[in-house]
């Protein structure tokens, strides 16, 4: 599949979607995007910058949600033009899709909205590549009908993203079989290595996380075989305004990516035949 200006798939190198969870300030987004461009350029990794203008599903109603649509799009446009990288953001049910699609290169649907038929169709009808996150409550094979809805709009640039499955209260688990199962959708599969270590609502008024397991799950996913990696990152996760406990430190991103790209090369060299 053609994504932005590069090809993605199991016959192509791993690509990266990364950035801070939420847009905190113009300068932070430019700094992080610039550093990620430097790292990915050095390693030869195709890169899409990600950040959200509105986090509509925060645990607490008083938590920081972002700068909003107008200011958020200004920041994303600045990142795109000044840093020279494609940008992705997530949208919601009442987002003016065409307005967002006029700025960003890739749209993303939140996991909680994966079963909302009209929403999925409206996003995909905007004509941009779409990264559809699998709900924490959804079986991997249940992504096939979701993709069918998405492609019924005529949009063939659809990706599916694994971000963990609910495992009791305040916990997620990553079933690596799902990455293989979701290939049956015919779409590139992306693994979200940072939300997969989230502890939803685990801190009472906010979600917790176990970022020490990000490399563990990322390595496992790459070994199974994926097209892309999604990872939220921050210069100082302890001060991040959203999802800090599961964000990967920016100064450790190069080391992680270097390892993952080596694993990706070996994995894809040996193919993906299923064994009975």
UniProtKB/Swiss-Prot annotation:
Q: What is its main location?
A: cytoplasm
Q: Which EC class is this protein assigned?
A: transferase
Ordered alphabetically, the record's keywords are: Cytoplasm, Lipopolysaccharide biosynthesis, Transferase
One GO MF annotation is: 3-deoxy-8-phosphooctulonate synthase activity
Catalytic activity as recorded in UniProt: D-arabinose 5-phosphate + phosphoenolpyruvate + H2O = 3-deoxy-alpha-D-manno-2-octulosonate-8-phosphate + phosphate
Output the superkingdom of the source species. Bacteria
- Which cell locations does it reside in? Cytoplasm
State the name under which the record lists this protein. Answer: 2-dehydro-3-deoxyphosphooctonate aldolase
